[in-house]
Each structure stands twice: as C-alpha cells, then as structure tokens.
C-alpha cells in the first residue's frame, strides 16, 4: 500500500478572528487536521502602559489602568492603588476595604460570566451566551449606580475609594446575590452534563500540577491542575480574612476542570459579597492623610513633612525611595506590579505582571498533537484579554 505524503500546511489564525478573544495571531502548522506546531504572535495591542506610568502621577495614571484588562477593571485599579499604599504605608479605613472587596468580587463574577458566554459560543453553544449577558447587565447596573460608569469605573483611590455607595445600593446588591445563586445552578444544568460539551472539553488541554508550577501559571489555570493556591488566602490583602470561604480547585487539569473551577468561583464570590454586605462597618471611605515624604511623623525636626489633606490624595504624592512587589488575585490569575519609588511624584519603574501573558505561553505546548478544532477550546479555557497581554 502506498502512503501519500503531504507537506505540512501553515494556517494563520487571527488577528481578527472572532474566537481569538482580541487581536491575537496564531501561526498553526497542520498535518491534515492534526496540529504539529503553534506560534502565538502578540503585541498588536501594545500601548506602552509601563512607560506611560513612569511619566504620570498615580492619580493621573488611574484612568489608564482600566484599559489593561477591560473586563475586570476593578482589579487593575486595586493593584494601582495598593502598590503606593504599601510603599508609603498608608492605612485604608475598614469601610473602604469592605467596599473594595464587594466591588472586586462583583467584578470577578462579571469577568467569569463574560468568559463563560464566548467560551460556550466557541464550542457551538449559543444559548448560554444570552442568559449570561442578562446577569452581567445587572452587575453593570450596580457598578453604574455606585461609580457612575458601567465599565471603566475609576473608583479606587490611594487610601480608599472615590465615594460611598448610594442609599439603597446595599439592599439592591443583596437582592442580586439572592437572584444570582440559582442562576449558576441553571448554567450548570444547561452545560455541565451535556454530552456534546463533555466530548469537546474532557481530557483536552491537560496540564499536570508540576507543569502548571513550572510554567508560572496562576488563577483558575493553576487551581484546575490540583494546586490550591489563591492570593486572597495566601497574602490576606484587604479584609478577606473576615469572611468564611474556601479555595475552589480540581484535579484533572483539563478544559472541563477549568470550567468547573470558574463556575464554583462565581458561587464563592457571591457568598463573599453577601457576607461583606451584611457586616460592612460604618466610618469614612477614604484616608484623608497622605505622607508627602518618607520620614512621616517621626521626623526629628518638625511636622511640616507630614501633610494632612482636606480632600483627596494629592496629585503631588511622593513615593519613597523603596521597591515593592504587590499582587492581587484577579479573575485570570496573579496580577502584580513591581514598583520602584524615587522620592518623586512619578514612579521610577512600574513593571506589570499580567496573568494572561504568562498563561498564554503554555498554549503551543497544549495544542501540539491535538485537532485544529481543539485550539478554540484550549485557548478559550485559558481566558485571555489582549489589552492585558500586550499592555
């Protein structure tokens, strides 16, 4: 029997393909339907976010950061204010910390919802997409009532939040939580045991725990591989230790495990929001003192180098000559900022550690030997946003 030998075919997927989740290009080498190699090409959405940060004060830079991961903007704002707060040792009032946690967890739910809808659409299931957008709109209505904006919120400030939530907002948010928990059960009833869905995701794109650690993966990608690592438990930032919740993880490390982790995280986030709303303390929502110089009150000379501000944190807030790495558990993984201050209003160095950029690097490893159709499944399960990958 004579075997016909064919040359490998090179296919360029993207950068404008709808299932690329942004301007990502994949150069795929195929032997028939089988993937021999895959090379991601990133950088189409690079805007120089790190260099912009080094030429702006923190207050000026805050509106820019919502353009990294534009579907989970609360987290990019949180990391931007947390870095100078830790560097200058600025305390955040308890009420502001609770409000931050509520906003962060609502943002996590919205991000996971907008991951689930397109992921199912990539697999050919269009129906869940419309249900998911219905709930996401409700979260955006809550954001609009509290911050004035549906997406680019610009709500976090150095030392607190921009404003307290309006009258009746807490009750409305509690009503949403009561409404949303049964909806997650509805998604699971629609999706989880569907035989077509299971054939597309079970055993596809498997990552072992050791692989996940070696590649530096974080977030649901890491927890789906059996590594129970969540920065909300590890670093205990904001006031997460005040609430009762557990880290969601799976053992199999495939696309199904990543789906299950995110579905359960939506439930966990809703329960954290409920606890925070029921036990939110009174008091100010912003720390109205900012340290102008690194000495603070302990200066042996006088009190002039410690500045009390009547209103907002000053745009001339100086960052001490120190360096610090700050991280938060974003919906896609560990979002970090390495900040070097220089006794100046501008940061000397502002290095962003985006989870999407780290997580997408394992993609060529996962798709080798798989079918062409599995690329969409695996890429969708990673959950990337190109604004954050390219910065």
Swiss-Prot record:
A Pfam family: Complex1_49kDa
Protein location: Plastid, Chloroplast thylakoid membrane
Gene behind this protein: ndhH
Membrane topology note: Peripheral membrane protein
Source domain of life: Eukaryota
Transmembrane segments: none
Function of the protein: NDH shuttles electrons from NAD(P)H:plastoquinone, via FMN and iron-sulfur (Fe-S) centers, to quinones in the photosynthetic chain and possibly in a chloroplast respiratory chain. The immediate electron acceptor for the enzyme in this species is believed to be plastoquinone. Couples the redox reaction to proton translocation, and thus conserves the redox energy in a proton gradient.
Keywords in alphabetical order: Chloroplast, Membrane, NAD, NADP, Plastid, Plastoquinone, Quinone, Thylakoid, Translocase, Transport
Gene3D superfamilies: Cytochrome-c3 Hydrogenase, chain B
UniProt cross-references to NCBIfam families, sorted A to Z: PRK06075.1 (NF004739), PRK07415.1 (NF005649)
GO cellular component, one term: chloroplast thylakoid membrane
Protein name: NAD(P)H-quinone oxidoreductase subunit H, chloroplastic
Catalysed transformations (reactions): a plastoquinone + NADH + (n+1) H(+)(in) = a plastoquinol + NAD(+) + n H(+)(out); a plastoquinone + NADPH + (n+1) H(+)(in) = a plastoquinol + NADP(+) + n H(+)(out)
UniProt keyword ATP-binding, yes or no: no
Gene Ontology MF annotations: NAD binding; oxidoreductase activity, acting on NAD(P)H, quinone or similar compound as acceptor; quinone binding
Oligomer status and interactors: NDH is composed of at least 16 different subunits, 5 of which are encoded in the nucleus.
Family according to the record: Belongs to the complex I 49 kDa subunit family.
InterPro entries in alphabetical order: NADH_Q_OxRdtase_suD (IPR001135), NADH_UbQ_OxRdtase_49kDa_CS (IPR014029), NDH1_su_D/H (IPR022885), NiFe-Hase_large (IPR029014)
GO biological process: photosynthesis, light reaction
Native species: Nephroselmis olivacea
EC nos: 7.1.1.-
